Curated annotation (Swiss-Prot):
UniProt-recorded name of the protein: Energy-coupling factor transporter ATP-binding protein EcfA1
Gene: ecfA1
Keywords recorded for this protein, A-Z: ATP-binding, Cell membrane, Membrane, Nucleotide-binding, Translocase, Transport
Compartment(s): Cell membrane
Protein's organism: Staphylococcus aureus (strain bovine RF122 / ET3-1)
Role, per record: ATP-binding (A) component of a common energy-coupling factor (ECF) ABC-transporter complex. Unlike classic ABC transporters this ECF transporter provides the energy necessary to transport a number of different substrates.
Gene Ontology terms for molecular function: ATP binding; ATP hydrolysis activity; ATPase-coupled transmembrane transporter activity
Top-rank lineage group of the source organism: Bacteria
């Protein structure tokens, strides 16, 4: 399979957690564009988190294929390909493994047998990129939730991934910390040309994306740019998703397009 513009491709993927259970994913096909921000959105039970598990190998497909950089993922090559993908999970407390910040970032590098001098350089650079270098010696209980997620991103960046998956990574943060983290992710994507995949139930987060995949009941419900998705926003509420505030207001005002950021809403008003 040759697709130079996609980093990950799902082709007719189906999955069930138990052989006698209903399928969580049903004949799912989509492409993740290389170097872009893709948001995979859906309510609970839509299959979005299962997609993340398949991408990082926690689960294996029952039928269909997953390709990474044009290579079909198999048991033989998975470990090699997996090293190129980093993931940040929902609960920041569950992913902090070091006693202090810099040890947490170094943990993955130690597992990859990175030499000490190189490890020190990578840890410092990664913490600097997420504005946490001054807190390198802090214990986790001295950090806010948003700061812990920054450390989690630094731990991933230190491994030089091509893809970062955010699995509901902002869902436990307050609105300010959430927006700060999304701004950081946008900066990291731009500076390193990293592919971002955000798994979320929050359509506000999808507004940040270049490419949006909406999941419903284990199938792809809609796919396109954020503008394309929100220009037909009425269908999103029927599958249990809550529209972002500026789009709700824009619809109430009767404007032609549904897609609107907070800044755009202010301009309209």
């Amino acid at each position: 399979m040759e697709d130079k513009n996609s980093v990950i491709v799902f082709k007719n993927v189906s999955f069930q957690y138990q052989s006698d259970a209903s399928f969580t994913l049903k004949d799912v096909s989509f492409n993740i564009p290389k170097g872009q921000w893709t948001s995979i959105v859906g309510h609970n039970g839509s299959g979005k988190s299962t997609i993340a598990k398949l991408m990082i190998g926690i689960e294996k497909v029952k039928s269909g294929e997953i390709f990474y950089n044009n290579q079909a993922i198999t048991d033989d090559n998975f470990e090699k390909l997996r090293k190129d993908i980093g993931i940040v999970f929902q609960n920041p407390d569950n992913q902090f493994v070091g006693s202090i910040v810099k040890y947490d970032v170094a943990f993955g590098l130690e597992n990859h047998a990175v030499p000490h001098d190189e490890m020190h350089r990578r840890v410092s650079e990664a913490l600097k990129q997420v504005d946490m270098l001054e807190r390198a010696d802090y214990e986790p209980n001295a950090l806010s939730g948003g700061q812990k997620q920054r450390v989690a991103i630094a731990s991933v960046l230190a491994l030089n991934p091509s893809v970062i998956i955010l699995d509901e990574a902002t869902s436990m943060l307050d609105p300010d910390a959430r927006q700060n983290l999304l701004d950081l992710v946008r900066k990291v994507k731009s500076e390193h040309n990293i592919t971002i995949i955000s798994i979320t139930h929050d359509l506000s987060e999808a507004m940040e994306a270049d490419h949006v995949i909406v999941m419903n009941k284990g199938t792809v419900y809609k796919e396109g740019t954020a503008i394309e998705i929100f220009d037909h926003a009425e269908g999103l509420t029927t599958i249990g998703l809550d529209l972002p505030f500026p789009i709700k207001i824009n619809q109430m005002l009767g404007h032609q397009t549904s897609f609107l950021t907070y800044e755009g809403l202010v301009d309209q008003l």
